[in-house]
Every structure is written in structure tokens, then in C-alpha cells.
Amino acid sequence: SLRYMHQRYTAKPDKVKGILTDISTEELSHVEMISAILYQLTDGLTPEQIKEAGFDAYFVDHTLGLYPQSAAGVPFTAAYFQSKGDPITDLTEDMAAEQKARSTYDNILRLCDDPDVRDPIKFLRQREIVHFQRFGEALRQVQDDLNSKNFYCCNPSFDSSCGKTACRRKMR
């Protein structure tokens, strides 16, 4: 969510900015859904259940408070996402992020048989596919506004002359 929200400020055209805004807003609801699932799974655990589940190291640091970290226990950091200010770079990375999220949901579904977890995860997985497609549309929009023979000749968010004819001049 934060990645897309920050990228929207330099995104052009406005349609791409709108896509980034819409998806960043929806991704916040994904965080809420995952947090609700985690809370429901951990609420009321006994010390014995915590130890049995291998959850004791987490419990020592956070009790049952939700703390953003990977499945391996690596804490979340803003270094996980990027905003380069180049829409081709950013949208390509966004598409990869959506595919990684989908793969993570696939792995959760392989390991989980609880329908109260599986059903919302299936929903989130489908939304990641839609986001991937929307970012693909946004990337095509950016590329359509550029010189079709060389998308990489300039940065459309920075170079004011970046357009269909911009790459006829040599880059310095």
C-alpha cells in the first residue's frame, strides 16, 4: 500500500495516478484482513498452545500483539518497497510485488485447511491477480504515451519533453 501511495505523486498520466491511488487504498484493506485473521487465530491462546505451535519466541517479544514480520520472523522494513520516480521501473516492480503476494497466498493455501482462513486468502489472491492486470494496463498506458521504438529513452515523470518524439534527440 505504501509503495503505491508514494509512487502516485510522480505518476503520469492521471489515469496511472488513479490506478496507483485505487490499488494503494485497497491494499490497506488487505492489511486489515490479514491482521484480523492473525488476531482471530491467536486470541485466547494458552501458554501451552503458544509453545506447542512454536509461537513462544514471538510471544516473548510481542505477547499476542500483531507485529509486522515475515513467516521467518524478519521484521518489516520500508526497505522492502521502492519508489524510483520512473513509471516504467515502478510499475514493473509493482507487477512483480503483486505476483509475489499471489505466490505467498498460494503457499498459505497449500498449508492451511481452515475455511475461515482459506476463504479470505482466496479472495485476496484473486485481488492480487486483478492488481497485476491493472498495473499492466497502467504500464501499457505509459508506454503508449512514449516513443514506441524506445520506451527507455527518458523518464516521463521527470523529462518534460518525454513523449512520442522525445527520443529523436540523443541522450546526454
Q: Where are the language model's segments positioned?
A:
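Non-heme di-metal
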Residues: 1-172
